[in-house]
Amino acid sequence: MFTLKKSLLLLLFLGTINLSLSEQERDAKEERRDEMDVEVEKRNILNTIINLAKKILGK
């Protein structure tokens, strides 16, 4: 009986660690995705400004 309890506690502990690591990995991926979105937005704004300047200058 005691061995069964130890085994169950070990499984619970390992499952908790696995869940925690998965959450950290998911959060890291989400942060990278957010950073890439910001970079894309910056490029889009820059391209829009360049296109407007070309239209204004007539080129």
UniProtKB/Swiss-Prot annotation:
Residues 16-44 form a coiled coil. Keywords: Amidation, Amphibian defense peptide, Antibiotic, Antimicrobial, Cleavage on pair of basic residues, Coiled coil, Cytolysis, Fungicide, Hemolysis, Secreted, Signal. Residues 1-22 form the signal peptide. The keyword Cell division does not apply. InterPro entries: Frog_antimicrobial_propeptide. Its main location: secreted. This is Temporin-HN2. The lineage of its organism: Eukaryota, Metazoa, Chordata, Craniata, Vertebrata.
